[in-house]
């Protein structure tokens, strides 16, 4: 037996224990060597405009693994016409940005950040890995990273998506409004100017 149940919480126990099995909510598959690979959480699934559900973690990991500047990424789609992303830069990556572009205007920096953001799509480890519909069309830079202090990370350093949404849901909504590309670019330019002191 994995566990008897949650202490004094029959409702939560009933949701996860069925016929002596614990349903964790993790999504995964067995690889060719028979190892279980966990790829995400059922609760975190996004919904493409065609109704297809997909896990955001693989794309988020691909972006952070290939990006020179972005340390955290949360992608979003709930049957919207396209996927969007929120990105953060830790202190080291902000310093890297300042060092790389200390004499360059914010517009040029944003062009370079856009190229950097989309690097994963052509990277050999990820090329052709994700359907185009799942890949973020727009990204918005956030003024602070996700941390335990702002409750956007939990104690195991995992992103708390609903807390990010509580804080930045309005920003996400503007990424779907008319002139979303221009509005998101203006938002990003303001943050870039603050980071680079231009």
Language-model region placement:
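C-terminal boundary motif of the adenylate-forming
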Residues: 27, 32, 67-91, 125-129
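Short amphipathic alpha-helix segments
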Residues: 57-65
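Conserved C-terminal "lid"/linker of ANL adenylate-forming enzymes
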Residues: 72-74, 81, 120-198
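Conserved ATP-binding/catalytic segment of the ANL
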Residues: 1-48
């Amino acid at each position: 037996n994995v566990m008897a149940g949650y202490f004094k919480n029959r409702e939560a126990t009933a949701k996860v224990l069925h016929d002596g099995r614990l349903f964790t909510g993790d999504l995964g598959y067995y690889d060719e060597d028979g190892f279980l690979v966990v790829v995400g959480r059922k609760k975190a699934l996004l919904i493409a405009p065609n109704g297809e559900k997909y896990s955001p973690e693989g794309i988020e990991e691909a972006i952070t693994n290939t990006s020179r500047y972005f340390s955290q990424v949360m992608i979003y789609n709930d049957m919207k016409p396209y996927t969007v992303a929120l990105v953060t830069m830790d202190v080291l990556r902000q310093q890297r940005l300042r060092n790389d572009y200390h004499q360059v205007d914010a517009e040029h920096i944003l062009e370079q950040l856009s190229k950097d953001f989309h690097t994963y799509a052509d990277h050999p480890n990820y090329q052709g890995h994700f359907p185009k519909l799942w890949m973020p069309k727009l990204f918005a830079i956030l003024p602070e990273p996700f941390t335990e202090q702002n409750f956007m990370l939990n104690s195991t350093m995992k992103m708390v998506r609903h807390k990010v949404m509580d804080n930045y849901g309005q920003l996400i909504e503007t990424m779907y409004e008319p002139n979303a590309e221009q509005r998101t670019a203006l938002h990003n330019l303001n943050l870039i100017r603050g980071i680079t002191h231009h």
